[in-house]
């Protein structure tokens, strides 16, 4: 309780989280998971290699005693130690961590009271604490409008004006996405594990 985890216990063995769970490493994982040029297996494999400090290539994945648990615990870490994803439940990507970098950092900087990109280390959970404390901001306005567009809600006049004046923030793919469930069956199939 009230600890920032820097390792994951898998089968009684501790596996270090790369860079002690720094937010930049997690954002790299998010980019890997969203990489449309990779298939699902490659996305998950890339993400596990980025996430676990002692896993640096595909062959080293065998060091993990249970790939399924390793993947589930990684996702649990992303979700701030929760089994379910915190925040707004939606079937749409409302944030693009790469394209929205300046907006995200500006809003987080305002909450944190410093330029977050200049600190050598900031744990993912700390970063997300700042992120969840973002109040009224350009980012909040943009995400609110994106949500309305994605869910086919009518925009207010000021939102239409903002959208028309800032089209660069609204050229996203609003098609529905499916939450990738790291199901036992899928992971066994991917990793050829038989239990």
Question: Model segments located where?
Answer:
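Short N-terminal mixed-charge amphipathic segments
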Residues: 1-56
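Acidic-enriched, low-complexity/disordered segments with a strong bias for Aspartate over Glutamate
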Residues: 22, 28, 35, 39, ...
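Alpha-helix capping and helix-coil boundary motifs
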Residues: 35-46, 59-67, 155, 176-186, ...
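Alpha-helix initiation and N-capping motif
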Residues: 23-26, 38-45, 64-71, 101, ...
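A glycine-rich, hydrophobic loop/mini-helix early in the fold
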Residues: 45-87
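Structural motif
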Residues: 16-17, 36-43, 61-65, 94-99, ...
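C-terminal charged interaction modules
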Residues: 71-195
């Amino acid at each position: 309780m009230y600890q920032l985890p820097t390792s994951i216990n898998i089968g009684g063995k501790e596996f270090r989280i790369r860079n002690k769970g720094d937010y930049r490493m997690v954002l790299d994982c998010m980019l890997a998971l969203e990489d449309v040029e990779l298939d699902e297996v490659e996305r998950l494999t890339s993400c596990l290699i980025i996430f676990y400090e002692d896993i640096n290539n595909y062959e080293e994945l065998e060091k993990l005693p249970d790939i399924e648990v390793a993947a589930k615990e990684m996702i649990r870490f992303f979700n701030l130690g929760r089994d379910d994803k915190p925040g707004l439940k939606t079937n749409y990507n409302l944030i693009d961590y790469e394209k929205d970098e300046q907006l995200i950092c500006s809003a987080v900087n305002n909450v944190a009271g410093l330029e977050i990109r200049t600190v050598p280390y900031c744990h993912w959970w700390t970063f997300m604490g700042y992120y969840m404390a973002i109040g009224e901001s350009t980012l909040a306005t943009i995400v609110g409008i994106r949500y309305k567009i994605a869910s086919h809600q009518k925009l207010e006049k000021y939102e239409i004006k903002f959208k028309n004046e800032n089209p660069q923030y609204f050229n996203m793919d609003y098609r529905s996405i499916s939450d990738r469930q790291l199901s036992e069956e899928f992971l066994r199939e991917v990793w050829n594990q038989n239990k």
